[in-house]
Amino acid sequence: MAAEKVREIEVPQGVTVTVSGATLTTKGQKGQISREFRFPGISVRTDGGKVIVETGKDDKQTKATVGTYASHIKNMMTGVSEGYEYHMKIVYAHFPIQVKVEGKDKVTIGNFLGERKARTANIVGETKVTVQGDKVVLTGINKEDLGQTAANIEQACRIRKRDPRVFQDGIYITSKA
C-alpha cells in the first residue's frame, strides 16, 4: 500500500476533538485523552467533523509518520467512546499464583513457582486492573497504557533459567477487545 500525504479521519458521534498547537485532545463519554503530535513537516488540524493529518514532503519516513499519527488518533477516538479491555489468564501447574492489585499503580504476583518473594508489575496511566478467580481483566481508554500494563504483568511472570516447555506457569493475554 502506498503511503499517503493526507489522511482524513472521521470523528465519531459523541466525540469532540480539539487541536491546540501540536496537542490534540479527544473527549468522549469514557473520558479524555491528550497527546502531542510534533514532527517536522506534518500538521494536524480539524475541519468540521474530520481530523486531517497532512504533509508537504515526499520522503518515506514523513509519509509513514502521517499514517502512524492517523492510527494513533483513531485509537484515541475509539478509547474515549468505547474503551478497551484486555483479558489475561493465570496459568499454574503446582503452586497457585496469588495476584493482588495494590493501590492504583502496582500488581503483586505471589507464590509464583513457590517463590517466597512476591513479584511486582507497574500499572501504567489510568488503567484499571481487576482479578476475578483465574482471570485478570484490564480496562481503560488509552490503548498504549493498557498494552504496556499487560506486557508488564506478562514480563513479571517470565521464567528464567528453566525450560519453558516444561514450566509454562504465568499470566498470559487471552483476548483483546
Curated annotation (Swiss-Prot):
The keyword Transmembrane does not apply. Keywords: Ribonucleoprotein, Ribosomal protein, RNA-binding, rRNA-binding. GO terms for cellular component: cytosolic large ribosomal subunit. It holds the Pfam family Ribosomal_L6. One of its GO terms (biological process) is cytoplasmic translation. GO terms for molecular function: rRNA binding; structural constituent of ribosome. InterPro entries: Ribosomal_uL6-like, Ribosomal_uL6-like_a/b-dom_sf, Ribosomal_uL6_a/b-dom, Ribosomal_uL6_arc, Ribosomal_uL6_CS2. Belongs to the universal ribosomal protein uL6 family. This protein binds to the 23S rRNA, and is important in its secondary structure. It is located near the subunit interface in the base of the L7/L12 stalk, and near the tRNA binding site of the peptidyltransferase center. Part of the 50S ribosomal subunit. This is Large ribosomal subunit protein uL6. It comes from Methanocella arvoryzae (strain DSM 22066 / NBRC 105507 / MRE50). The gene is rpl6.
